[in-house]
């Protein structure tokens, strides 16, 4: 949910965990501090003042602590910043999983690739294997797979997400 699509669709922010980061936040490119910075106003200013695919130098954001450039808060290397908000969301997520350890649950994976499989994909597989009431579902064009151990309780749809959603909408409208 780095792009806030769940929030735009009406989901409560407190029910989301941006484990991979957030396009709406900057962080120090050197991760000198475990702090993130809202970037909407700065990004809008950049858009308004850009010319010939360039922005004015004074709009390049810098860390208020060390003066290094700020960058998007995205998990792409070992410099990813996990701020206080990230840790609060992680705790809410872990609590959600703990309180539903053996309940009926769907681990739904939409478009998760192999950039950082240890963050979402592998834990979903492990939790599905461990919970007899769990189902794993993956929609991913070209990468909808699961391990043999959970194949009997998995749904892997190897197609573009928009096609799958449109098909679901069409079936609902046709009462299928």
Describe the residue ranges of each PLM region.
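Conserved catalytic alpha/beta core of Sir2/sirtuin-type deacylases, generalized to analogous enzyme cores
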Residues: 2-176
